[in-house]
Amino acid sequence: MIEAVDICVQRGKKQILKHVDLQAKNGAITVIIGPNGSGKSTFVKALSGEIPYSGKMTLNGHDVTQTKTSKMATMRAVLPQSTTLAFPFLVHEVVELGLSINKFTIAKKQFQNLPQKTLERVGLADYGHRLYHQLSGGEQARVQLARVLCQIWEPICNKIPRWMILDEPIASLDIQHQLVVMNIARNFAHRGGGVLAILHDLNLAAHYADKMILLKQGKVYCEGSASTVLTTQNLRDVYSCSLNVSELPQADIPFILPQTAQPLMK
């Protein structure tokens, strides 16, 4: 489980996160949504140990600030919003970083084919010897997902709870590969892993999320099922635009359509 209690993040004079409390459970997909600047990525950076914060954050019962980075790396893998790398890595070298973090070696029989298998899962089977920095943004995001899958090799999930932390994993992808990524996340959760994802596509979020957390101006505005969170009034209040929310036929899943492209006048 991921548990955050009274999390605050300050950047200069501006408070980015304001007393955030939230929980995300293993075996489920928890999706954080909210407008740009609401604190979504800041929360992920705090959870990843990239930025300081006040309050308490635990992952599988381990305090994020008190646990060695090497230990945390065995329990969670992060797909960051930016997938740019400064060095001229080959694609297979980027993917193999996931194995090195967990102190696995490519020479071990059970792991030697894992990087290639994960590239196949994300639709990049023939990309292993291409230069990473020459790929498109969407291709780089899929390579990073392959790295994440290597780092939290799924069959281990039932012995050591593992987490995927995904910061806008589908932002640069076409619809085909958006579904590939989200189905990988769903399968990972079904196998006992935990998924915490930031998404901007509210309709895909509604389809895949077991729990949704809506942020507004650094605070948790509401949380719960998609039907609870994605109401016309909630979205109007948080996003300041007119949206119509209905339900998909034969499914208890909200579906969102714009009523107008113009922002509400205040």
Swiss-Prot record:
Which Gene3D superfamilies does the entry link to?
Answer: P-loop containing nucleotide triphosphate hydrolases
Q: What is its EC number?
A: 7.6.2.-
Q: Which Pfam families does the UniProt record give?
A: ABC_tran
Q: Which residues bind ATP?
A: G34, P35, N36, G37, S38, G39, K40, S41
Domain (ABC transporter): residue spans on this chain: 2-242
One GO CC term on file: plasma membrane
In the bilayer, the protein is annotated as: Peripheral membrane protein
Q: Which InterPro entries match?
A: AAA+_ATPase, ABC_transporter-like_ATP-bd, ABC_transporter-like_CS, P-loop_NTPase
UniProt main location, coarse = membrane
What molecular function terms (GO) are annotated for this protein? Answer: ATP binding; ATP hydrolysis activity
Q: Which keywords does this Swiss-Prot/TrEMBL entry list? A: ATP-binding, Cell inner membrane, Cell membrane, Membrane, Nucleotide-binding, Translocase, Transport
Where located?
Cell inner membrane
Q: Any keyword Kinase?
A: no
Q: Which NCBIfam families match?
A: PRK13548.1
Subunit relationships: The complex is composed of two ATP-binding proteins (HmuV), two transmembrane proteins (HmuU) and a solute-binding protein (HmuT).
What does this gene product do? Answer: Part of the ABC transporter complex HmuTUV involved in hemin import. Responsible for energy coupling to the transport system.
> What family is reported?
Belongs to the ABC transporter superfamily. Heme (hemin) importer (TC 3.A.1.14.5) family.
PANTHER family from the UniProt entry: HEMIN IMPORT ATP-BINDING PROTEIN HMUV
Could you identify this protein by its name? Hemin import ATP-binding protein HmuV
Give the source lineage, highest ranks first.
Bacteria, Pseudomonadati, Pseudomonadota, Alphaproteobacteria, Hyphomicrobiales
